Amino acid sequence: MTTVYGYDSVGNLLTQATSGASEIAFSYSYNKNGYITGEVRTEGGKTTESTYAYDALGQLTSFLQSTGYEEQYAYDKAGNMTEKVLTGTDGIETALKMSYNKGNQLTTMVNGKDKIAYTYDKNGSMVTKVLTSQAYGKLTDAYAYNALDQLTEYVGYDGYKQEFTYDANGMRLSKSEVGNGNRSTLEELLRGNIAGLPEIVEPTQGQINADEADMPTELEWATTEYLYDLTQEYYQVISETTTSSGGASSTTAYAYGLERIAAFTSDSRTSYVYDGRGSVAQAITAPVTGEAVSSALPDVSVQV
């Protein structure tokens, strides 16, 4: 897979074309301040155009796709987003309004008669998100932290739970989770389905504000442990191994260039293609033979 880039005289990316396992191309235009104002994405013979507009402070005020999907934004004097209006490809608008406390922390997000309330501890870390909804009633996400303000536990509105451990240097050692990770956030449930965006995953009645005792007995805890490359300026996760409470285990190894470029399992390789904004535009998975994980791991100092 090969990607060719083209730049203007000041280093702005103008064109990007990937060939081989992926056939995808991008072109970009910019305003005088260097902000992207236009993107053209061509993939599989289909072209999607996106345009971006900004205010005098460089804050994004609108995003419009040729599909008809649109987002508009408004801000207060402190630069906090106070309104986000999403217009689906069917022309239906959804307006989300946000408010903040004196510390510029988000305190509420409102969609009509539904809202999410956010609370924080004395260190400024979010401890709860509570959705009050006509469709779902009251749903709560809760967060807990250690003395260093590192997230140690997340308990979701549907019983999904995560626990985290760290080493003495603050690097995450492991993540344990139970429940179905294929779920929507409270913010997604607040806005609801919008034409042009992926459909939300609605919780069942039995999932609403469930706790661990309510979880189906067949669900297992799974723990992921991380291996780091310490030779880089910013430590990179070079592999992660996930083991279920039943003993099943799988490892994924990662390769990097300027970004993460590939992931390897025992029988597959996933290659990543990025757009000009640094977001993953494509993930291409193909089967491989042999010790894919072992061959992907670099010979470096690592920490578990």
Feature map (PLM): residue ranges:
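Alpha-helical "lid/cap" subdomains adjacent to substrate-binding clefts that gate access
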Residues: 233-239
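Extracellular, surface-exposed repeat architectures
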Residues: 104-110
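Residue-level markers of secondary-structure register and packing in elongated scaffolds
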Residues: 1-15, 27-33, 37-40, 45-85, ...
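Short, solvent-exposed aromatic-acidic interface loops
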Residues: 241-245
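GD-rich hexapeptide-repeat beta-solenoids
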Residues: 26, 95-101
